[in-house]
């Protein structure tokens, strides 16, 4: 087996990350298992780095440098006192700058540049209509829209009315036959 194959075989034999224990170079506080909720779920409690990432290092939080009595006002500068651009004084920055004049100047330069550009016309295969009104809008109840579907709808309503009318007449006849079957034979 060559040297390269030996290295590959060694790499395959390494333990998975969950079984790795802290090395002897770690401090004694990190060698002890951390007691937390994550300790019961898996072997994460024995690895202080994973416990710290997952928030299970409650026992190590006693050596914190944070003082609850110290206010945040003394540590963090308020954002309204911080200048984003110290090089320019904001009072004198826009002095002599008129938005309307600058906009007019930019537009004049733009028009002068593009008026000097020669645009040659090409033969185009697509032509658009020159009319102002390209779409003709009609109301939904226009006579032009009437068709065979409307006749079918009228026929359907007429037949429904006939069925209800004949049902009233025939129901009384059938009810009499049902009540007195001997009388009608």
Swiss-Prot record:
One of its GO terms (biological process) is symbiont-mediated suppression of host innate immune response. Residues 1-38 are annotated as: Disordered. Residues 126-128, 170-174 are annotated as: Important for host CHOP inhibition. The keyword Metal-binding does not apply. One of its GO terms (molecular function) is protein serine/threonine phosphatase inhibitor activity. Induction: Expressed in the late phase of the viral replicative cycle. It holds the Pfam family PP1c_bdg. The keyword S-adenosyl-L-methionine does not apply. Keywords: Host-virus interaction, Inhibition of host innate immune response by virus, Inhibition of host interferon signaling pathway by virus, Interferon antiviral system evasion, Late protein, Modulation of host PP1 activity by virus, Viral immunoevasion. Residues 1-15 have a biased composition (Basic residues). Interacts with the host phosphatase PP1 catalytic subunit (PPP1CB) and recruits it to dephosphorylate EIF2S1/eIF2alpha and therefore restores the host translation that has been shut-down by the host. Also inhibits the EIF2S1/eIF2alpha-ATF4-DDIT3/CHOP pathway. Belongs to the asfivirus DP71L family. Interacts (via C-terminus) with host PPP1CB. This is Protein DP71L.
């Amino acid at each position: 087996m060559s040297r390269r194959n030996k290295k590959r075989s060694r790499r395959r034999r390494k333990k998975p990350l969950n079984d790795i224990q802290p090395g002897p170079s770690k401090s004694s506080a990190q060698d002890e298992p951390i007691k937390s909720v994550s300790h019961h779920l898996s072997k994460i409690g024995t690895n202080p780095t994973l416990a710290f990432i997952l928030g299970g290092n409650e026992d190590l939080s006693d050596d914190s440098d944070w003082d609850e009595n110290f206010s945040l006002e003394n540590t963090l500068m308020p954002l309204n006192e911080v200048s984003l651009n110290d090089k320019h004084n904001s009072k004198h920055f826009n002095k002599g700058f008129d938005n309307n004049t600058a906009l007019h100047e930019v537009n004049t330069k733009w028009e002068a540049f593009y008026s000097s550009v020669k645009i040659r016309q090409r033969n185009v295969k697509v032509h658009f209509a020159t009319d102002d009104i390209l779409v003709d809008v009609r109301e939904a109840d226009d006579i032009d829209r009437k068709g065979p579907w409307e006749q079918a709808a009228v026929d359907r309503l007429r037949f429904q009315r006939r069925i209800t009318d004949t049902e009233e007449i025939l129901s009384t006849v059938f009810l009499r036959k049902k009540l007195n079957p001997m009388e009608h034979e």
